[in-house]
Amino acid sequence: MTTERPADLMEKIISLAKRRGFVYPSSEIYGGFAAVYDFGPYGVELAKNIRDAWWKAMVYDHDNIVGLDSAIFMHPKVWEASGHVGGFSDPLAECKECHARVRVDHLLEAVGVFADEKMSETEINALFSEHKDKVKCPKCGKSNFTEAKNFNLLVQSNLGNFTGDWTLGPTYLRGETCQGIYVNFKNVLDSSRVKVPFGIAQIGKAFRNEITARQFIFRKREFEQMEMQYFVHPSEAATTYEEWREKRFNYYVETLGLRKENLRWHEHENLVFYAKAAWDIEYNFPFGFKELEGIHNRSDYDLTQHSKFSDTDLSYLDPKTNEKYIPWIVETSVGLDRTFLAVLTDAYTEEKVGEEDTRIVLKFPKKLAPVQVAVFPLLKNKPELVEKAREVYNTLRQDFRVEFDDNGNVGKRYRRQDEIGTPYCVTIDFDTLGENPGLEGTVTVRDRDSMQQERVKIEELGTYLKA
């Protein structure tokens, strides 16, 4: 059974994300910019914690996976070799009534018809024509469209084109990060001590000229990928693939704390010609189950293509057997933004407090929370309380992500920290200073999830908060 979600959950998450500084529409003072978003002060911390968790799980927890940070701009032939120049496209149609441009596969999906991503332009148009009376424009509601045309998603740039002479052809902002890994395969092999099987991990920005911008940060034109390409002997690819499937599913439950019932597997029935297997881990977003991470057995296609187009030998010579071969690749690929949205969705909770009040709380795992501890003086107009609170704050910030807050009454401060997802709030009051001799040197610690409060000695605070 999946967790029941209110119909307006997406709207509530978007509102909270802006109100509490997680996500802002980009360039909002100019009216915004479709499918482009900025992380605010708490969003950037949550995103960093997600990156760090992924990097630890993929790189630091393995002795045969190394990191890479490849450039966003690459030689134009990289994208020819990868197939992006000729085949990286979505089917586009224009509404003849309001001139809105929309993805045909999304229009069909809205009426329960699913178009295979490998369909030719002719095939997608035949399917589109078959269901044209049911398909409605999302903007004006009419059913009057042009034929579908394939629209390339690569974002073209004028980089280096000072004279208008495109000697190398147009340059692009990268459409995916993995190509930077493939073209550096030989460099990593030659400069480090890795041997097959080994992996290369990378986190970085990618860009796609998406036709339809929707579903908040789930589908963006500028987004961040976290990918690992694992190079193996062809005979070990199938076994390795299953091992990584298990590891990656467990990661979301055990490391990120997502509820297992909100995750499921989806197998690709129709594979691209070079792929041997492709499964997605799907998460139950407010708009339904959608892809969170893809795990793919890509065979030797990528290294073979780049070897051919670059005229560079990208084969591997096994030092033990002297066998020479092109390694196969097992890929794990996830979007940071989608992970961010999944973590935010899973954490979002509304709870009744008393008979009439409702509190909103983000129940992040402690290690992901943007702020781990908030420190309050009971009153901001009492210098002795503020001074002691600052002292506690400065001590705790050596080991925790800490925020100091003295605005408003303590109850309102609690609610604000609940909406930020802060696991603990520490309040310095007059008992801390010795008004009650039996409580001198103690503080009140309030737990986010239970709302229970406990007195803890200042010298024991660090140990208590780490428990």
Short names for language-model regions:
Residues M1-A467:
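NTP/phosphate- and nucleic-acid-binding module
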